[in-house]
Amino acid sequence: MASDTPESLMALCTDFCLRNLDGTLGYLLDKETLRLHPDIFLPSEICDRLVNEYVELVNAACNFEPHESFFSLFSDPRSTRLTRIHLREDLVQDQDLEAIRKQDLVELYLTNCEKLSAKSLQTLRSFSHTLVSLSLFGCTNIFYEEENPGGCEDEYLVNPTCQVLVKDFTFEGFSRLRFLNLGRMIDWVPVESLLRPLNSLAALDLSGIQTSDAAFLTQWKDSLVSLVLYNMDLSDDHIRVIVQLHKLRHLDISRDRLSSYYKFKLTREVLSLFVQKLGNLMSLDISGHMILENCSISKMEEEAGQTSIEPSKSSIIPFRALKRPLQFLGLFENSLCRLTHIPAYKVSGDKNEEQVLNAIEAYTEHRPEITSRAINLLFDIARIERCNQLLRALKLVITALKCHKYDRNIQVTGSAALFYLTNSEYRSEQSVKLRRQVIQVVLNGMESYQEVTVQRNCCLTLCNFSIPEELEFQYRRVNELLLSILNPTRQDESIQRIAVHLCNALVCQVDNDHKEAVGKMGFVVTMLKLIQKKLLDKTCDQVMEFSWSALWNITDETPDNCEMFLNFNGMKLFLDCLKEFPEKQELHRNMLGLLGNVAEVKELRPQLMTSQFISVFSNLLESKADGIEVSYNACGVLSHIMFDGPEAWGVCEPQREEVEERMWAAIQSWDINSRRNINYRSFEPILRLLPQGISPVSQHWATWALYNLVSVYPDKYCPLLIKEGGMPLLRDIIKMATARQETKEMARKVIEHCSNFKEENMDTSR
């Protein structure tokens, strides 16, 4: 079962401070520059958390705006101490690192910070005496500086600049540096000379860097415990160097199988060398490699029985010489992952759910190209089979979507996987907190990636949630995104259909403040434009019907939205739809329901008082469409118009008396036990028609409506009628001289129903 644990006080305080920087930690010096309050001192635990959480909020939160001078809060180590920070994406620029250059950083991770230039290399020197861990993964421009080819020093003259590779920077002076990640650097960075000054490297990541001569790695053969050479084109020479690094505990020579043609194949001899020469090895990743058949035993030879991780039983022959099982073995898109006996506690691969989840976990941060394919496999598992590690799967997909907000493949596969992982089959296993995280990343995807497949997947995933309840915490944002999707210039019918359905659900069963806010966002106008487009195409489909239904819901007891409907030619569209689609019963019901809402607004009723409109409403009294619904709603519209009295009847034809007679006839033709396709949140608009004598037919319609609802749905509507004070009003009708006898009889029956209901449900326990 799912359980919700509250956020820690530290997490809540951090979030609040970051969202209110100039009201908590700092103040604005000149309307834009942040400064820390002079009486504040923050230790490293708090400062590190503030910076790392800030980066997370900028990259993952929808409603969080980065502050240009945020890093200036940490410029003075006498009041703030930074030690371990992780920065990513375009958020970080040269001036941000410059702002914190006086800090004694121990750990600095810069991931895909493409806006950093060679200026930041000089800033890095400021941390040289304290830095132990440094990652420059994906910072592809940090070894470039701009050069003015004209040699002109006047910065106001327009001269094009070109980027020049910095070749004289080295890690000279970084005496404490032990962990270094240079993954995804450009190929022509002189890695060997760059690294030569580092005497005691323990971990090195050269992912994606090509070097034909790896002999320089041997200078750390007595210290290097982790080496990552992902997507490096290997040769026998590389292998000869690697096996000299006898202290290695983690070796990653995996590759992206789809990246390029690759001649090197892992042989039985190479794997045997790793086992023999690298005796401390605990983790090995050979994902994506072609493996020669002589590396494994045949299916026929594999030992029967339960799978084993004991090296002696290994289906991979060279690994039988291992002293103990590996902690991790990367075999994603590698034929060895399908063997039965693999000597490792954790295996990444594509054979089963466990291997696929291990792959997503291992590769998400730095290898989106691999992660997207692993998530695609998870999608198939969730779609065709059953996901047995649901919570782990959901958390991993959420992390991947947060981490790679602008990666199309991740967004497509991740949003598709979420659709299956959040469906009703798995619902009881998910906490409110986790489901909210899903909603956040889905909305992030819709916001960041305007692509048809992503948008469709995200909309479908939102359909798995209880609407509007589960989306209420992001109510405004989700409506804005859906309305942008419904822009009529977009032609994708399937997305339109899902988005209109969601919009309709979002404005159903919410309070009037929400409806008014959504109306001001352009909801009413957007729906009318969709209807207009469908009319031009002479098409009455789900989009058309959902659009009218959404308008019916959003105008319920919301006068501003009703007025908007009238102001933007809503009545013309109503008449045109009625004429173009005379047989569409569902459409007629939705349109008349909406007009019932408009008619409830006294100030707007004069706009309905035209011969054309009154004639249309009168004719619809005889409609048998959708049971009694169209006739009932048409009568409701006319009841409110009649309620304004004879003096408000501003048309000669049809005459008021004639319409009144048709209304009486229609009401008498309805079956009082009719099941209804309607949902009243309040009886207030009906109840206001009871205490009056100016229009007995309106009073009768209102009484009939109450009698029908309390008869057919007593559990729902008896308490509502009692709560809203309907009983005294009905008793007054019985005493009224102007009320018709049949109306009085009906009022008595309503009172009787509600009285019986109260007695039956009275609690007599002691």
Swiss-Prot record:
SUPFAM superfamilies referenced in this protein's UniProt entry, alphabetically: ARM repeat (SSF48371), RNI-like (SSF52047)
ARM repeat ranges, renumbered to this chain: 427-467, 511-556, 558-600, 602-643, 714-756
Modified residues (N-acetylalanine): 2
UniProt keyword Acetylation, yes or no: yes
Keywords for the protein's UniProt record, in alphabetical order: Acetylation, Leucine-rich repeat, Repeat, Ubl conjugation pathway
Entry GO CC: Cul2-RING ubiquitin ligase complex
GO biological process, one term: protein quality control for misfolded or incompletely synthesized proteins
InterPro entries named among the record's database cross-references: ARM-like, ARM-type_fold, Armadillo, LRR_dom_sf, LRR_Zer-1, ZER1-like_C, Zyg-11_UBL_adapter
Pfam families for this protein: LRR_Zer-1, ZER1-like_2nd
Impact when changing residue 9 to S: Abolishes interaction with ELOC
Record's keyword annotation contains Acetylation: yes
LRR repeats: 226-245, 246-268, 278-302
Family annotation (Gene3D superfamilies): Leucine-rich Repeat Variant, Ribonuclease Inhibitor
Tissue: Expressed in testis, spermatocytes and spermatids (at protein level). Expressed in spermatocytes, spermatids, prostate, skeletal muscle, ovary, small intestine, heart, brain and pancreas.
Functional description taken from the UniProt entry: Serves as substrate adapter subunit in the E3 ubiquitin ligase complex ZYG11B-CUL2-Elongin BC. Acts to target substrates bearing N-terminal degrons for proteasomal degradation with the first four residues of substrates being the key recognition elements. Involved in the clearance of proteolytic fragments generated by caspase cleavage during apoptosis since N-terminal glycine degrons are strongly enriched at caspase cleavage sites. Also important in the quality control of protein N-myristoylation in which N-terminal glycine degrons are conditionally exposed after a failure of N-myristoylation.
UniProt-listed PANTHER family: PROTEIN ZER-1 HOMOLOG (PTHR12904:SF23), PTHR12904
Assembly and interaction partners: Interacts with the ELOC-ELOB/Elongin BC complex. Part of an E3 ubiquitin ligase complex including ZER1, CUL2 and Elongin BC.
Similarity comment: family membership: Belongs to the zyg-11 family.
Name this polypeptide is given: Protein zer-1 homolog
Taxonomic source organism: Homo sapiens (Human)
UniProt gene name: ZER1
